[in-house]
Amino acid sequence: MRWWPALPLLLLAVAVAGAGDAAPVCTRPSAAEAIVGSPEACRSPLRRPLGVTEGDDAILARAVNLLHANKEDFAAVLFYASWCPFSQECRLRFEKLACIFPTIRHLAIEESTVRLRTRYRYGIHGYPTLFLINSTVRVRYHGPRTVKSLAAFYNDVSGINPSMDPAVGDDNIEPKRDCEQEKCLFWSARTPENILQPDTYLTLAASFVILRLLYLFYPKITAFVKRTWSRRTLFTCLEQGKHKFNRVYPSKQGNLHDGARHATAWASKSLASVSIGEPSTS
């Protein structure tokens, strides 16, 4: 009967183990797992849709890696700009789509948080730009940015049916019809300084190329500058010599001008006298 004092402790250990098996503890998902989900994540039937998740370049890369692990999952990625009115309008519709398609993870990325090489990889030349991606495909949306059209695009690419009628999604969204273009172009809205600012490696590469070109063309540039400077110096010296000569010998120059004027007057008088004397001799 020596094991009777240890019986309560044994029963407590069995109860704790049974409770652990019945109700496992859900760990907090990371930012990338919150976008596309994870096989190890707890999938409760009462779990609400996550809506739109704001991300950056690093979160996008991790989300793509998780999509390769979950081959049946889809994610919608919207690249937008806060200064673009079309992006603001599309951002509201993107939130509507997150409610219409709760099984598709929605990631919104603002243009200031994405490096330039990511823009080149996805071919982003204007805002807003929408992609549907999974482990095998990456489809860009081209068409009218209405909730109904976007929902049809989701259905065609992913095969997922909407959870509600997409026709009611545009009721409280006022379209921007005061502009002629349909997209805010990236290159026309940013200066070269702002383009080089987000990516340090691009700045260093551009600086190296510029310095390399200067090194290659430096002899030619130097020779051209020397020739131009020598010609300019020679012309300046000639002009200065001419002015000095005029200051040193002003009388001779004046006498030459006076002599030329007198010679012209004498020639005109001689011609006049000859023309007058001809009738008297006849």
Swiss-Prot record:
Disulfide-linked positions: none
Membrane-crossing residue ranges in chain numbering: 205-225
Residues making up the signal peptide according to the UniProt record: 1-19
The keyword Lipoprotein is annotated on this UniProt entry: no
Alphabetized UniProt keyword annotations: Glycoprotein, Isomerase, Membrane, Signal, Transmembrane, Transmembrane helix
Membrane topology: Single-pass membrane protein
Pfam families (alphabetical): Thioredoxin
Subcellular location, principal: membrane
Molecular-function GO term, any one: isomerase activity
Annotated glycan sites: 134
GO cellular component: membrane
Domain Thioredoxin: 20-159
Subcellular location(s) of the protein: Membrane
Highest taxon of source: Eukaryota
InterPro entries membership: APRL4/6 (IPR044606), Thioredoxin-like_sf (IPR036249), Thioredoxin_domain (IPR013766)
Protein's recorded name: 5'-adenylylsulfate reductase-like 2
Native organism taxonomy: Eukaryota, Viridiplantae, Streptophyta, Embryophyta, Tracheophyta
Protein's gene: APRL2
